[in-house]
Amino acid sequence: MMEYATHLSRQGYAFIPGDYYRSTEAMQFSNKEDFLDELEELKKGYENLLLDPYSPGNRWRGYAQCKKNEKGELTFGKFNPYKQTKAFNPDTGDIIRDYPLLPEAITRNRLFQTLLHDDLSLVDAYESIGPVDSLTIGIHFFRYQATENEPAYSSPVWLHKDDEDVVFVHMINASPNMLGGDSLIASHPRSIDRVLRLEQLFDTLVVNHDKLHAVTPVGARENSGPAQRDIILITFQKNEEKTACPV
């Protein structure tokens, strides 16, 4: 974990392979069927998301916030209004938005809990934004759903920084007919430092405020039907800033 926290601190981002999460003790199941059952339950959460009514892009969304108390206990709900600033997202900044609350079947899911707890530990190891019990923690489920003639894309659609101090992007599923969905890292709007793709289950990109980032629009291969990209964003923000991540 420390190598990823160090890379985040020095480079402004880190790529964490999905194998890292799958090798953690919390993901060691007594048999493969139990793991697959948990994964199937997690994926079902994407069937109950809301098509984003606040901006175009064919993105389906669900949302929750998480609090960690001094005893280490986690609670989930909507504790603060979900709003972005115009400075970071000129498209929908300063608009309070509401999305379906993620159900307990998701927030109690063992695989989701493993991702969340590991992210909490990495932010603690990062040591640059304070203890996690002093931060606003956002959980965003996103489905990018594209067809041949209707791509799916983020907001803002190009290089940007987020309101949040640290953002994790976890890959859950990408359909084989998907085009695009590449992550870009940049030091300057006219200079791309790295292009990478989250492909395998739990492949993760984590970014801070030091670098710009973007994800390229998602499309579908010709005559292949809809293409989907399902991700989980887990965001961490100092409480003096009451805004949330533009995606």
From Swiss-Prot:
Species: Pantoea ananatis (strain AJ13355)
Protein name in UniProt: 3(1)-hydroxy-L-isoleucine 4-dioxygenase
Cofactor: L-ascorbate; Fe(2+)
GO MF annotations, alphabetized: dioxygenase activity; L-ascorbic acid binding; metal ion binding
Name of a matching Pfam family: 2OG-Fe_Oxy_2
Entry keyword set: Dioxygenase, Iron, Metal-binding, Oxidoreductase, Vitamin C
Signal peptide: none
EC number per UniProt: 1.14.11.75
UniProt entry tagged with the keyword Metal-binding: yes
Reaction(s) the record says it catalyses: 3(1)-hydroxy-L-isoleucine + 2-oxoglutarate + O2 = (4S)-3(1),4-dihydroxy-L-isoleucine + succinate + CO2
Gene it is expressed from: hilB
Cofactor binding, note field: Binds 1 ascorbate molecule per subunit.
Family membership noted in the UniProt record: Belongs to the iron/ascorbate-dependent oxidoreductase family.
Domain of life: Bacteria
Residues annotated for Fe cation binding in this entry: H160, D162, H213
Function, in words: In vitro, in the absence of HilA, can also catalyze the oxidation of L-methionine and the C-4-hydroxylation of L-leucine and L-isoleucine.
